[in-house]
Amino acid sequence: MSLLDKDIREPLFMYLEIKLGKVRFFEEKEIGRARADVMMVTDDAVIGLEIKSDADSYARLKRQVRYYDKYFDYNYVVIGKSHLKHIEEHIPKYWGIISCTEGGEDVQFEEVREASKNTKRDMNLKMSFLWRRELETIKRECVKFKYYDLSKAQLRAKLIEKVDEQTLDKLISRELFDRDYTTLVD
């Protein structure tokens, strides 16, 4: 039997939580002119997960890879077994591959290839996931001078200029972990 996206998601989340510990998932996240199936946040990275079930084709994958590479620190393609033979032809070498198969009543996962750091990621685009108040929280913590009346784009640029990348990675992850959807967004 073929695995569909809906069969893969929840078991995938459980697999990654067991494997990695503290993670947070955001589904169907807009990234430029594409949509990430899953954005996963760890303590110091934001990771893109593109699901290619047995029913999916590679038609949009080339364009999706371009956008994933702009936004995420690491990227994985999660594939049904029908894609195992040819997936490497369609993704960069630094992308990870997680294969999933049916095993009785469960979905089994295997990390076929670990993802390497994505050097094409644009910090400004990664920071665009943050709401204004999250950017302001980072600014209050890290920037000595007060900058008022900055647009979100100007605030992101100022933080990139003033705060080292490793610190920003951790602070972005913290803000995404702490995000509260019960309060109003900006």
Predicted regions, residues:
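Active-site metal-binding core of divalent-cation-utilizing nuclease and nuclease-like domains
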Residues: L3-D43, I47, K158
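Conserved N-terminal glycine/acidic-rich loop preference
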Residues: G32-V46, E88-G104
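Short acidic loop-to-helix transition motifs that present clustered carboxylates
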Residues: R33, A55-D56
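Active-site ExK catalytic segment of metal-dependent nucleases
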Residues: I47-D54
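Catalytic cores of nucleic-acid endonucleases
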Residues: D56-C100
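Non-catalytic C-terminal interaction segments of nucleic acid-processing enzymes
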Residues: G96-D186
